[in-house]
Amino acid sequence: MKHSQPRGLSRRRVEHLLSETKNDRSTGNRVDVLSRHFLGHSYKPNPLIGSADTAEVFTASLDGFDCVTYIETILALARAVNVDDFIEWLRKIRYAEGRIEWARRNHYMTLWIRNNVRTGIIRPVSMPAVPMLIRDRVLNVVPGLAAQRARVKCVPKPAVPRLAAYLQSGDLIFFVSTAKNLDVFHAGIIVRAGKSMLMRHASRSQGLVVEQELSEFLKANRMTGVMVMRPQGVPGRIAVSNQVRGLSMRRIRCAQRSDGAKRRGGK
């Protein structure tokens, strides 16, 4: 059974994107190809709809992103075989247990990572020869959300160049904040280009989805360190949940508004 058409989302556009990678069984390659497609698209601050006192609306936009919705969209496309799969994977990636509620949204990236590791969508990249740092944080930057304790394990900034031996195109990189009340301040997708290590990301400062040298971003930004995750699995159908099947067109909207700065803003 097909979903109701999300307002503003062209099924043909999603189908075209999926057709470009349908014969590639490597999730990393699919992430690489799909993330390239959106270079030059607009950065959209606060792209999600919902708050502590506003009903959550499940949104799916291919027109503009913050750093997190860019990654979520690419991951969902990379795992999907059709439009309904794309919508379902996006729901599972964005919300704890796939439940479309503001309180269940993965507001902080440590939670986002933990829940997506648990469901087998991503896994940590093994880097046995790279030093790791552990920092405890109390996360409290989202209005209306109770403070959460988080333990952040990351590669310290000075050691990031040593990651070159381990990273692959399609890996996800998360930049750990120096603030004691925030875990991650930005995220992107790694691309290997010969000896160069590039990153694709929705850049707030440039107003676009861009590709740049990872070293340039590291030089320009203060951070404690980075975390790296690798997308898992191959494309496959996913059972359509009753929650999404029953959503009206009012509840699924392709939107270009509300939630980015509160929800770990992009650089």
Label each region the model flagged.
Residues 1-267:
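Cysteine-nucleophile amide-bond enzymes
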